[in-house]
């Protein structure tokens, strides 16, 4: 996989198409949609939620848009956070060895728009 390291250095990001196989990402997507609907028993400090006075999921619970440290809670998230291809890509753009410091996921459900925040 080829990364545009120059773009990363100049703009602070680069696109890494095909970094993680789609099948692995679909497992994460399905789990995130389940989290969106309240399918968890995680501590609340793992989530950033939309204003509960305005937004509720289909079960009446809060609508999470951010998940902090999901790899601490479930293997499916650890598999991505510790994915060897992700580590290799980060080492390439950062020009040296890397260490996992944190992990997070963002959730974009159909009811979430730029007007939601």
Indicate where each model-derived feature is located.
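Non-heme Fe(II)-dependent double-stranded beta-helix
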Residues: 2-11, 17-117
């Amino acid at each position: 996989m080829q990364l545009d390291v120059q773009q990363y250095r100049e703009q602070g990001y680069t696109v890494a198409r095909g970094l993680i196989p789609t099948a692995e990402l679909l497992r994460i997507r399905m789990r995130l949609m389940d989290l969106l609907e309240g399918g968890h028993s995680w501590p609340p400090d793992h989530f950033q939620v939309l204003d509960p006075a305005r937004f509720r999921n289909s079960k009446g619970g809060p609508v999470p848009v951010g998940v902090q440290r999901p790899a601490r809670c479930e293997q499916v998230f650890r598999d991505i956070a510790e994915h060897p291809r992700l580590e290799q890509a980060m080492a390439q753009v950062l020009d040296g060895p890397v260490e996992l410091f944190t992990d997070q996921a963002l959730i974009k459900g159909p009811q979430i728009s730029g007007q939601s925040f």
